[in-house]
């Protein structure tokens, strides 16, 4: 399954003209919840954005500038994005709606010039999921527990949370209209395979 599926979708290169990969997608199909694989879909969307970023001529220059502060590792993590996501989902028991909200948050911080790359994509994903989880569900886990699950220290988690909230200007609210737009995009591969 490909994210693009022969559709003309905008480039997800993170720059001042960043456009969400959701922006041009629309569908009238209904979601078949029994056939969902939200973890794989979520990871594929992030990997698609990452692959689009790699096409940018400024990609390696932006990696070397280390402009993303606490989001950026000094070395590439030794765990794949999908394995890291699977670990988070295993211990946090997250609803698919939370992953959709996390995707909205990732778009918001990318619009604020966070350039997704191999050095920051794990942390951007982690903090976006955690903030969506905190906002969307009855959060029973604290930063200490999430630090244990994520492999980061509690102070790193607090720093990520502060940076994240600053970047999105504390805009955690997601309207129903925006949520539905992202939900349709999120399940596009599943819907395409059912047709």
Give residue ranges: language-model regions.
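Channel- or pocket-lining gating/hinge segments that regulate access to a cavity or pore
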Residues: 144-187
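Residues that form ligand- and interface-recognition hot spots within folded domains
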Residues: 46, 129-134, 150-153
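Amphipathic alpha-helical interface surfaces
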Residues: 98, 121-124, 156, 160
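Acidic, Ser/Thr/Pro-rich regulatory low-complexity segments at or just upstream of the first helical elements
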Residues: 1-97, 101, 105-115, 158, ...
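Extended amphipathic alpha-helical regions
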Residues: 133-136, 185
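Short alpha-helix boundary/capping motifs
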Residues: 128-131, 156, 192-193
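Short conserved catalytic/interaction loops centered on acidic-Pro-aromatic/His motifs
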Residues: 115-121, 135-150
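Contiguous, well-ordered alpha-helical segments that form the cores/surfaces of helical PPI scaffolds
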Residues: 100-108, 122-134
